[in-house]
Amino acid sequence: MQNTLQRGDRVLVDKLTPWFGAEPERGEVVVFHDPGGWLEDTQAPEPNVVQKFLSFIGLMPSAEEKDLIKRVVAVGGDTVECKKDGPVVVNGTALDDKSFIFPGNTPCNDEPFGPITVPEGRIWVMGDHRQNSLDSRYHQELPGGGTVSNDEVVGRAIVVAWPINRWATLPVPKTFDQPGINATVNTAMSLAPGALGLAGAVPLVLWRRRRLTRGRTAG
């Protein structure tokens, strides 16, 4: 997810609104459980006392869970594709992702894909460090065809909370608001004043499978 997020960052995750039936929206950064096979060769780090306590009271995903963080690019019913040297296209509308993908990356030159129709109740996710991310593109052989069930989503990452000098919100990039994408506005996802009370500070270093490709490591 670099440069949007850096290794060691902690993010606040809105875990409240999914309880009321809200679903992930295009452009959001979400934390989700391993759908199965995405982190199969990753070993769990030993949780510290603070992490165990936060997990116990519900302010943080369980240390035993395998969680990932990616950006939602397409939702159920969408058609998404990306050809070599081209942009990511959702429902026929090209995304301008220069504002959030890693500098020097291309939208998908390392792994072109599609067109793919995302099943209802599932999402297609991609990392912002496109040439260094094991995302939906690399799991199309698994059940779900690389998509993630909405039921696996822990919540939306809304703020980089730590370290202090990196504090920043994580808004949805404007390119996902283009009329042609036909984004559905889910009012339940709007953060109420009390929503942050059930947010968890998720350390991005907990579960992170690294991809080795031509001498590069993944994040």
Located regions from the model:
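Soluble "head" domains of membrane/secretory-pathway proteins
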Residues: 3, 7-219
